[in-house]
Amino acid sequence: MADSLELVIDTIMAREVLDSRGNPTVEAEVLLEGGAIGRSIVPSGASTGAHEAHELRDGGKRYLGKGVLKAVNHIEENIAPALCGLSSLDQATVDSVMKQLDDTDNKSNLGANSILAVSMATARAAANGLGLPLYRYLGGPMSSLLPVPLMNVINGGEHAANNLDFQEFMLVPHGAESFREALRMGAEVFHTLKDLLSQKGLSTAVGDEGGFAPNLESNKAAGDLLMQAIEQAGFKPGEQVSLALDVASTEFYEEGQYCYGGNSYSSEQMVEELAGLVNSFPIVSIEDGLAEDDWDGWSLLTKKLGKSVQLVGDDLFVTNTLRLQRGIDENIANSILIKVNQIGSLTETLEAIELASRSSYTTVISHRSGETEDTTIADLSVATKSGQIKTGSLSRSERVAKYNQLLRIEDELGSQATYAGLVGLGPRGSLKG
């Protein structure tokens, strides 16, 4: 067991590195007195909610304005002096000090990217100092639930240069006995889908999250393709592998109307469109089915589908306890997407997860479209017993890195490991029983 002095923060460094889109992002390193090091890199999103914490960029010509040297500077000149000498074990204090230093509601002074990088690196340094895996350090000895992956195998919207309006069409291999088997099932459907696309003369180029990005005549056509791929891979749709959608509807919401596919829909009509898809396909989860500030529309959607489908708020809640509490109070949605960089610190992320859990909302731990080799979210999904993770398709190493980390965790847990399966999917899981 490490001496408490060995776990005191000694040095904090930062640098500008690249994410999976070739854009700069922030990496932080926290060195403890005893020699343990924690390193973390923050992700960034393409379809970002208006209520997310502020990601600080440099502007100007360098990296087309997307440099992060200001954020790196803030870490080394403002954050490091304030944190050195504190215990890495006191995550809440570390994050609170940074929040006070920033002194804005959305972290626009220091930047959520600088605060989060240090926050996550501190947790990893503490875990390394104690000789514990990160999931065990964050979650304790009872953390043994492996999440169901929501695998984004067809990309559209802001994640791909194609004509699909909905952003993600996902596989959900809930019928597996283990995470390892779930990953295999997803990979087999992914490769079958690639063959199907090739046979139809469609593009097999991949989007930001590693899924295919073909031009298709409609969102329904994407669902039909996935059903065909699941069956041809030898699995039963709805029993072993189901579907999930990220509509990302804020991206095509204009003046109170949802405009896509050459048509405009009111909130009521959009709800009926989604209900029609649920009737046509084994859809277990819909994310951002309505826009981030269309609270009345969300209420209609929840009344229509909330007892049969997981309704996930991403742009709606932005990992923010204030917005989540409003959703809970108004019975809106039944699940929250958890993105660490939406709120900008590990402590606030854990608070959002705790509030959701207390209120019987499911949680889905999620990557961003601009990702890195950092695997923190894999450990976080196990630590928090979330039961679900979104980390892209079965290609691109920044996506696969998280899957591989979950394989390692499952191996390490051995007979203690439990795969969440259908139970992890909230209302749909309880109905299927």
Swiss-Prot record:
Active site feature: 209, 339
Keywords: Cytoplasm, Glycolysis, Lyase, Magnesium, Metal-binding, Secreted
Entry binding sites for Mg(2+): 246, 287, 314
GO BP terms: glycolytic process
Pfam family name, one: Enolase_C
GO cellular component, one term: cell surface
Residues that, per the record, bind (2R)-2-phosphoglycerate: 167, 339, 368-369, 390
Cofactor remark from the record: Binds a second Mg(2+) ion via substrate during catalysis.
Chief localization: cytoplasm
Pathway recorded for this protein: Carbohydrate degradation; glycolysis; pyruvate from D-glyceraldehyde 3-phosphate: step 4/5
Function: Catalyzes the reversible conversion of 2-phosphoglycerate (2-PG) into phosphoenolpyruvate (PEP). It is essential for the degradation of carbohydrates via glycolysis.
Name assigned to this protein: Enolase
Originating species: Prochlorococcus marinus (strain NATL1A)
